[in-house]
Every structure is written in C-alpha cells, then in structure tokens.
C-alpha cells in the first residue's frame, strides 16, 4: 500500500470539494462566505479546474434565476440527464460524447483549458461583480486560463507520476474523474433523485450525494434559501471554515 499516494488522492479530493463548494459556490456566487482578499484569490486559482470564475458564477446565477424553467442552462427536466450532467459544458447532447467527457479526468483539464473560457459565455453579465475584480478578469481570459490550467494539470501529472509512476497517473485520472462527476451530479442527480421540499422547482435533497459533495447534495434546501450555508454543521465544510475563521481568513453565516 502506497501511503503517500493515498494521502495525495485524499488531498486532491478535498481541494476539489473546496473549489466547487466553498470557493466558487458559497463565496463567489452567493457571498455567504467572506474570505480575506489575498486568500480568496489564492483559493480561486486552486479552483480553476472547475472553470473560469466569471463563467462559473454567471452560469450558476442564471440557474438560480430560472431553475428547471426555460432559461436554465442545465436542467435535466428540460434537456435530459447527460446534457445537465456535463453536456452543457460542451454544448452537446450526444450521450456517448457526454459520457467520454465525464470520464476524461486529467484529460478534461487539458480540453477545458482551451474550451471553457471560449464557450458558454452568455451569462457572464450576471457575474459583473466578479469580472470587475481585475485579477479574476485576467485569469478568465482564454489564453491566461489555458496556460494556468495546463500548467496545473502538468504539475499534478508530475506529482502523481513521481509518487507511483504509471499507477500514480492512473489514480490521478480516476480521482479527477470522480471529483468532476460528483460536482456535475449536483446539476443532474440532485434535480432527479431525492426529497423535494417545495413545488417551485425539481431540486432535491439527496443525502447520499451530500456525503461526498461537502453538503452540496442538500440541493432543495439550497434553492429554498441560497443565503444560508446549507448543511454547515454536518460536513467537512464546517470544520474547514472554522479553521479558517480561527486564523482570521474567513467569515460565514451561521
């Protein structure tokens, strides 16, 4: 058993969850969490595999404005499972192509580096507060984003290869495929399977999904009130934020 490889996989998983849940979602999109400016920028750079900050925030806010209605960019009710899961990133409804994209892992980072900052930008106007920050505007530009994400991917490959050779690279591919699919499952599975709390949309609380997505699986609660840090005391997000708060790096709503 390669203990160092296991630790590296766990750290990668944690950073993947922090990127989507704490940074892009709760901090940038909904302003539920306030981080020290320098620390926020550092964490956004680490979150770049999830997409550019401007595009991610704009698309997510559009989703909240038109949840499961005309105008929702990734509703499984409107477009089917695979388009909602990951096809909307690449504007493709072909099940096989969507499936290949979903399992691409580290190769998805290289593809996204070119594709994401150049496509699906129609909701960027909803993230003007993000693009008004010069640093976020700069790293969201196509060439800058591509270079940073490709460097990010190369560094990950070198780290995992140095730990366990080809096996390390295979495990890197697997953990990234898992992280991407867990994040994408919030847009697909959490709008199909689980418990509804109202009839205004199809968002559902999926407790099994919540266990692996830093509480994001409590999706119906989030859509009912996006200004509350959902499920905060029942997942790792709470403990991470408490640690950050102790060091004066974060403030968050209780």
Positions of predicted regions on the chain:
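Glycine/small-residue-rich hydrophobic helix-like segments
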Residues: 185-235
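Non-catalytic, topology-defining segments of multipass membrane proteins
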Residues: 1-184, 218, 227-254
């Amino acid at each position: 058993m390669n203990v160092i490889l296991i630790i590296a996989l766990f750290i990668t998983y944690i950073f993947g969850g922090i990127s989507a849940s704490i940074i892009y979602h709760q901090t940038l999109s909904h302003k539920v969490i306030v981080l020290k400016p320098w620390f926020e920028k550092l964490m956004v750079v680490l979150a770049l595999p999830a997409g550019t900050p401007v595009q991610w925030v704009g698309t997510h806010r559009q989703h909240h404005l038109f949840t499961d209605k005309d105008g929702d960019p990734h509703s499984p009710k409107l477009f089917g499972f695979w388009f909602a899961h990951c096809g909307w990133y690449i504007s493709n409804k072909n099940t096989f192509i969507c499936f290949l994209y979903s399992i691409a892992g580290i190769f998805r980072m290289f593809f996204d580096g070119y594709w994401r900052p150049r496509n699906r930008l129609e909701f960027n106007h909803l993230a003007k507060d993000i693009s008004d920050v010069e640093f976020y505007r700069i790293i969201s530009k196509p060439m800058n984003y591509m270079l940073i994400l490709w460097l990010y991917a190369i560094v990950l490959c070198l780290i995992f290869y140095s730990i366990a050779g080809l096996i390390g690279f295979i495990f890197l591919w697997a953990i990234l495929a898992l992280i991407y699919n867990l994040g994408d499952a919030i847009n697909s599975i959490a709008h199909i399977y689980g418990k509804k709390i109202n009839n205004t949309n199809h968002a559902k609380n999926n407790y099994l999904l919540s266990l692996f997505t830093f509480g994001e699986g409590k999706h119906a609660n989030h859509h009912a009130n996006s200004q509350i840090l959902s499920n905060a005391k029942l997942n790792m997000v709470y403990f991470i934020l408490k640690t950050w708060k102790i060091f004066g790096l974060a403030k968050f709503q209780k």
